[in-house]
């Protein structure tokens, strides 16, 4: 049905002034003012409106929609004119306002969309995603800072896009209209103002699986120095902490600050810090090899809280691929990727496709799945409901996918992000080599798709940093802090715990020496393998519920190997060589690290092998570090001899200046970190919420990064201790600070969905 000729004609004779709403900064007021502007514009049409009213009385119906699309003039239920919004930057708006008459040509080619700038169920990032899918044009937030409200004829071409915009739990569709001058499709510019859709905040934000931000709680408790306390008439518990990694140290420290006097930490190894392990070289103590955690994203807000608290917040960028000159070796051919530039042409399809996916999401059949950027934006802006519902859709549709099958489904389907279908196995192998920002992800392709996607949404793949002092300085400073006259380190017993058992109302700890001790509460921060095999905690349901036991026993622990080499000089600077190398051989990822940037003549440090899973398992067959280094050097030499010729230890000292570690064979670890396989995200849920399950509190609590949704990241090792400490204080009659995780109303997900 064509639009009313009167409406078409009236749009050709535009009024001389739009309503200026740029000073309006409240969504509800903008809603009212925009609606009033449409009403006033219709009233000004005089004779034409009179005649339209006559048509209405003859069978046309006029109505205002609740979401701000006003007015609609319809016949037989088919809309003739409705409202829409063109989103533009301040500069484009200025050009329009300076033109007389209104410069319709300025907005030609743009897309008007039926989402109002006062819509609080839609974020700016979602708007960017929708406009790209409707127009094929990319926008930055600065390009969408303002809007022009228009009345547009239904004769304009339109496209409807199903997107996860929720109102009372229902899916809504977004409609876009292409603004063109051809065909004289009528539209009328009515008002202009600022886009008030939700924008990201500059502060911390919750992770997608928790939707609770621990950082504000820690900040709030900084004033009092404690997250809870015990009234004078309440007896304090006797507590054992198993493991002196970062989780165990945080637990002990927070309990001591809360007034718990009797705290004992049991550590099986001869050092503290666990996987926060910085090896200092004897001849250059300021050069440190990070044997465990080494990349620290600013989005790890709790980690940075503790770094700031202990004076370690000075960080430097980690030399990830593409952020520094990077040498790529694929099938024996060498490619140079200059810092800050696009990768070599061979890699463009996978590079552009992945980045398009991050911004644009995935269009599959009947729905657009929210882009990772849009979900992150929702978390930043506090739109928790939308973030939750969008993530649940990803869980529903991709929860049973491996990272490999998920990538195949997205990039080999009919709507591949970036517009180019990937080829198999060529693009597959290129993507495995290049990765998603922090190096090749090929070895973890069989991990769950959701497991990798959550890292992206949580911001852990962005702006990763390195700690100049070595990250083990953090657990060292926590351990050296004196609380109530005694340091945390003085409470550490370096002995292995062989069993943890219930004994009436107490918990019995049996040590390797045969000695047993009774405690009121126990926090276990050991690796999952030790919880099962050494502590024997999953043999029955006396301590943990069956689903928790299952999660401990079956969660996948990733194998990882590192080999560091300290060189006589920073040869990559001397000879202008790339400081990052990615290869498809046994030496997967090589990083050159400078811990003494102020000294050009200082020692160099090369992480010559950082491998995961199968690539790590292969290296276990070569346990001798000198032999392993020779194998890696020879492999690099075949493609990059100019680099390999410098890979010899300073002073030819293989004993002191080469260090390696295999986390899978570490008897106190049993793997580097937890990485869920497809369909196993409910294991993380069971492990994380165990300490918060007050209905099944047995006095034993789990903590540690492997008991979080972010295995392998220090952030999880800082949040789970908070859960355990809160549980102990609460269960023993203490008083917790407001806003604690125990009193939070958790918005849980269904992780056991079927595709």
UniProtKB/Swiss-Prot annotation:
| Pfam family, any one | RolB_RolC
Q: Which UniProt keywords apply?
A: Auxin biosynthesis, Crown gall tumor, Flavoprotein, FMN, Monooxygenase, Oxidoreductase, Plasmid
The coenzyme or cofactor needed here is: FMN
What is the free-text note on the cofactor? Binds 1 FMN per subunit.
Catalytic activity entry: L-tryptophan + O2 = indole-3-acetamide + CO2 + H2O
Q: What GO MF terms are annotated?
A: tryptophan 2-monooxygenase activity
Which pathway does UniProt place it in?
A: Plant hormone metabolism; auxin biosynthesis
Quote the PANTHER family the UniProt record gives: FLAVIN MONOAMINE OXIDASE, LYSINE-SPECIFIC HISTONE DEMETHYLASE 2
**What family does this belong to?**
Belongs to the tryptophan 2-monooxygenase family.
The protein in question is named Tryptophan 2-monooxygenase
**What is the scientific name of the source organism?**
Agrobacterium tumefaciens (strain Ach5)
Lineage of the species this protein comes from: Bacteria, Pseudomonadati, Pseudomonadota, Alphaproteobacteria, Hyphomicrobiales
């Amino acid at each position: 049905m064509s639009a009313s000729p009167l409406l078409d004609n009236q749009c050709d004779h535009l009024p001389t002034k739009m309503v200026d709403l740029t000073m309006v900064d409240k969504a509800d007021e903008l809603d009212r003012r925009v609606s009033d502007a449409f009403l006033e514009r219709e009233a000004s049409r005089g004779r034409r409106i009179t005649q339209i009213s006559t048509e209405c009385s003859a069978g046309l119906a006029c109505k205002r929609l609740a979401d701000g699309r006003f007015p609609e003039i319809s016949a037989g239920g088919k809309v003739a004119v409705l409202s829409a919004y063109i989103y533009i930057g301040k500069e484009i708006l200025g050009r329009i306002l300076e033109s007389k008459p209104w410069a319709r040509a300025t907005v030609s080619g743009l897309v008007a969309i039926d989402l109002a700038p006062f819509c609080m169920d839609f974020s700016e990032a979602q708007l960017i995603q929708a406009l790209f899918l409707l127009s094929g044009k990319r926008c930055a937030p600065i390009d969408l800072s303002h809007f022009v409200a228009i009345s547009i004829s239904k004769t304009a071409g339109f496209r409807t896009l199903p997107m996860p915009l929720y109102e009372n739990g229902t899916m809504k569709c977004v409609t876009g209209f292409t603004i063109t001058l051809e065909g004289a499709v009528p539209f009328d510019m009515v008002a202009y103002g600022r886009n008030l859709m939700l924008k990201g905040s500059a502060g911390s934000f919750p992770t997608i699986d928790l939707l609770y931000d621990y950082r504000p709680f820690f900040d709030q408790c900084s004033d009092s120095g404690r997250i809870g306390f015990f009234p004078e008439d309440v007896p304090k518990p006797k507590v054992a902490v198993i493991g002196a990694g970062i989780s165990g140290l945080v637990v002990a420290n927070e309990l001591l600050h809360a007034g718990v006097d009797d705290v004992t930490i049991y550590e099986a190894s001869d050092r503290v810090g666990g996987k926060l392990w910085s090896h200092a070289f004897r001849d250059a103590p300021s050069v440190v090899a990070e044997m465990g955690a080494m990349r620290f994203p600013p989005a790890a807000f709790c980690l940075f809280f503790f770094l700031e608290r202990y004076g370690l917040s000075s960080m430097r960028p980690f030399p990830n691929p593409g952020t520094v000159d990077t040498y790529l070796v694929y099938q024996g051919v060498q490619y140079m990727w200059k810092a800050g530039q696009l990768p070599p042409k061979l890699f463009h399809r996978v590079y552009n496709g992945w980045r398009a996916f991050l911004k644009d999401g995935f269009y599959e059949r009947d729905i657009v799945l929210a882009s990772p950027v849009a979900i992150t934006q929702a978390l930043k802006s506090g739109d928790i409901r939308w973030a939750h519902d969008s993530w649940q859709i990803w869980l529903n549709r991709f929860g049973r996918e491996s990272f490999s099958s998920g990538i195949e489904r997205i990039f080999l389907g009919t709507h591949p992000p970036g517009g180019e279908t990937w080829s198999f196995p060529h693009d597959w192998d290129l993507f495995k080599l290049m990765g998603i920002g922090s190096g090749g992800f090929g070895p973890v392709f069989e991990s769950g798709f959701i497991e990798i996607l959550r890292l992206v949404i949580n911001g852990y793949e962005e702006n990763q940093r390195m700690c100049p002092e070595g990250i083990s300085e953090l657990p060292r400073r926590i351990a050296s802090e004196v609380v109530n006259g005694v340091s945390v380190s003085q409470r550490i017993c370096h002995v292995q715990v062989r069993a943890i058992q219930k004994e009436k109302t107490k918990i019995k700890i049996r040590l390797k020496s045969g000695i047993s001790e009774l405690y009121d509460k126990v926090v276990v921060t050991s690796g999952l393998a030790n919880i099962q095999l050494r502590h024997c905690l999953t043999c029955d349901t006396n301590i943990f519920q069956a689903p928790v036991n299952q999660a401990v026993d079956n969660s996948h622990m990733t194998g990882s190997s590192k080999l560091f080499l300290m060189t006589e000089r920073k040869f990559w600077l001397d000879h202008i060589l790339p400081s990052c190398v990615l290869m498809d051989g046994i030496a997967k990822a090589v990083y050159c690290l400078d811990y003494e940037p102020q000294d050009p003549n200082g020692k160099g440090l090369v992480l010559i092998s950082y491998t995961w899973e199968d690539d790590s398992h292969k290296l276990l067959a070569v346990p001798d570090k000198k032999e392993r280094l020779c194998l890696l050097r020879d492999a690099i030499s075949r493609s990059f001899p100019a680099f390999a010729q410098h890979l010899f230890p300073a002073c030819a000292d293989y004993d002191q200046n080469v260090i390696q570690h295999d986390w899978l064979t570490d008897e106190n670890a049993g793997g580097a970190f937890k990485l869920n396989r497809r369909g196993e995200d409910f294991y993380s849920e069971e492990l994380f919420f165990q300490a918060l399950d007050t209905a099944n509190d047995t006095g034993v609590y789990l903590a540690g990064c492997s008991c979080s949704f972010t295995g392998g990241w220090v952030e999880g090792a800082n949040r789970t201790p908070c859960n355990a400490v809160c549980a102990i204080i609460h269960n023993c009659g203490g008083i917790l600070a407001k806003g604690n995780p125990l009193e939070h109303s958790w918005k849980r997900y269904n992780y056991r969905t079927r595709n």
